[in-house]
Amino acid sequence: MAGMAAALAKERAAAAGAGRHGQAVPYLGQDFGALRRECLQGGRLFHDPSFPAGPAALGYRELGPNSYKTKGVVWCRPTELCSCPRFIAGGATRTDICQGALGDCWLLAAIASLTLNEEILARVVPRDQSFQDEYAGIFHFQFWQYGEWVDVVVDDRLPTKNGELLFVHSAEGSEFWSALLEKAYAKLNGSYEALSGGTTTEGFEDFTGGIAEWYELQKAPPNLFKIIQKALQKGSLLGCSIDITSAAETEAVTSQKLVKGHAYSVTGAEEVNFRGSIQKLIRIRNPWGEVEWTGKWNDNCPNWSGVDPEVRERLTRRHEDGEFWMAFNDFLRHYSRLEICNLTPDTLASDRYKKWSLLKLDGNWRRGATAGGCRNYPNTFWTNPQYLIKLEEEDEDPDDPEGGCTFLIGLIQKHRRKQRKMGEDMHTIGFAIYEVPPEFSGQTNIHLSKNFFLTNKAREKSNTFINLREVLNRFKLPAGEYIIVPSTFEPNLNGDFCLRVFSEKNANSTVIDDEIEANFEETEIDEDDIEPSFKKLFGQLAGSDAEISAFELRSILNKILAKRQDIKSDGFSIETCKIMVDLLDNDGSGKLGLKEFHTLWTKIQKYQKIYREIDVDRSGTMNSYEMRRALEAAGFKLSCQLHQIIVARFADEDLIIDFDNCVRCLIRLETLYKMFRKLDTEKTGTIELNLINWLFFTVI
C-alpha cells in the first residue's frame, strides 16, 4: 500500500515537471543548496549520513568488510591529500580519468566520452562547486535514471590506501571531479563494488538520458553509413574505438597513427564524387590531438585533388585539432566498435538538429501475476505487460524506395546493480513485437489473451534475450499499430523496467489493459420466494435471535466445507466471515437475517462451482494464473496492477490461492465496487472522500 502511494505521488510530481533536467529530483531527498548553506552557517564539513564513509560503501563481496582488498583503507578529503586540490582545472580531459582498483572501465570510457562535449558535461557535473568558493565538503552530480534526472549529493571523503586514491584519480593528482563523480555514481548504485562490469552504453545513457546503440564494425549492417548520417543530423553522440587484446596494447599506436583502446568521436559523414565514382568518407576526431590518421583521405592525401574544389574547401577548411577524414571502408577495417548515443529532444538546445520523437513507458513484472516469461512459456506469456505503439508517419527518406517507419526500442531493467549485495543480478530480458490484427485496431482496453499469442507470430523481436541492463534494437516497419511485449526469459521473476521508443516521426503509445468492470448478478427476493426447507435450516442454525453472526457463520460454513473432498481448505477464517457479513448486512445489525443469508449461500455455491471448473488439474487448489480466470468467471475484469495486488494479498509463497482466500477476494471486490457505485451517483468514475470516510472504507 505504501509503495502504491509513493508511486502515485511520484507520478503526480513528474506531471508537474519534476525529474526534467532543469528540475532534477533530489536523490534521497537531499537538497544540495540547503545542505551546503547549513554546513557553511555551522562552520563544519558535510558528512553524508545516507552514504557513510565506511565498509558498506565499498562493497559486499570482493570489496566487502573482510576482503584483503579493503584492509588499510582510509577515507580522506582532498584537502588532506594535497595542498591545493582543484575540482576542475583547465577543463575536463582524459588525463583526469585514470582507473583504480575497480573493474569499471566501462564507466570511465563513458566519462571520457563525456569530456568531448562541454555542454553535456556541464549537465552532469554542475560548475557551482569548488574547493575554494563556498567549500563545505559537499558536492553534487546529476544523472539520468529510468526516465528522470536525479541530483546526487556526496561528501568529499574518498577511499585511499597509502595516501593515494583507491579508485578513479587524475594523472596529475590534484584534480578531483572524476573521483567525486565516481563516488556519486557508486552511491546511486549502492556501493563501489556494484559498478564492476558493465557496458559503456549504460554510462552514456545515465549521463545524457539518451538511448545508446552499438555496432561491431566487422559485422556492420549494410546501411550503417546512412545510420551514421542520420544520427549526426539528429545531434547524436558518436564514439568509436579499436579493441585491445591485452593491457600492454592500451594507447598503442598503429602504423597509420591510430591509437588502440582510445575513445574517438565521429563528427561527420559525407559522400563525395572522386574521379567519377562516389566515395563514402567519415570524419573522426582524436579529442587530444596528438596523432592523426596517415592513410587515404588524411589532410595531406593527394586524393583531395580529385574532388570538386568547392566540396574540398567545405570539408577541410574548418578542421578542429586532431580531426581527420578517412574512407568509410578503412574505418570499418581499422576500428572495432561504433557507439551511438541518440539524445532526447530536451538535451538538444539547437534547432538545427532533426530531433527524435520519444515515448517512455514504465512497468513491472510481478511473480504470479505479470511475470509470464518469454514465448517458450505459452501458458503465461500472455500475462506480461502489453504496450500499443502507433506508427503514423513514414520516414522522410527519398533514397529509400521501400519506405517505412524507423524506430529504436530500448528495454531497461531498473535498480539491478543496487540489488547485487542482496544476491540479485541482472535478469535475462528481451521483447517481442506483434502487428495488431484488424479486429483489434484502435482498442486499448483488452489485454490480449493466450489464444492470440498461440495463433499470431511475432513481427519482430529483440535480437537476443540477454542479462544486461538494457536490450536495444533498431527496426523499420510499415505505418500501423503494433504491440510490444517485454518479458524476462523465465517466468515468475520480479522486476521493474522502463520501455523507451525513439522514432524518426511522431508516434503514440499506451498501455494495453483490461478496463475495470464488475458484472455480478443481483436478484432481489422476498422471504416468500425462499423454499420452506431453507427457512427450516436457517431457523436451526440461527437460534433464538433469528440472525447469524460472523462467528456462527464460520462454524456453519466450515462444517459444510469439511465434507467437500474436491476443495482443499483449512476452512474459512473469521476475517473472511466478517467481510461476508459486512457485504450483506443491510440493516447494520452486524448479523445476517434470512434473506441476507440466502443471498450469501447462493454466492458461495456459485464460487464453489467456479473454483471447481477453473481447477482443471483437480488439485483442489488454484494457482495465481487460474485465479485470473476465476475473477473473470465471477464477473470481474481487472487491470494488470490489480492482479498484482491480488496475488500479493491472497496467494501463498507457492502462488496457491485456497478457497477461503478466493472467496475473501471476490467478496472484497464486490463490496468495494458496490460502495463506489453507490457514491458515484453521476456515474463519472470519480468520487470524493474526506479523511474520515476514507478511513471507514479502507478498514473493511
Curated annotation (Swiss-Prot):
Binding-site list for Ca(2+) 2: 229-230
A GO term for molecular function: protein tyrosine kinase binding
Compartments where found: Cytoplasm; Cell membrane
Top-level enzyme category: hydrolase
Annotated signal peptide: none
Boundaries of every EF-hand domain copy: 572-605, 602-637, 667-700
Protein name: Calpain-2 catalytic subunit
Lineage: Eukaryota, Metazoa, Chordata, Craniata, Vertebrata
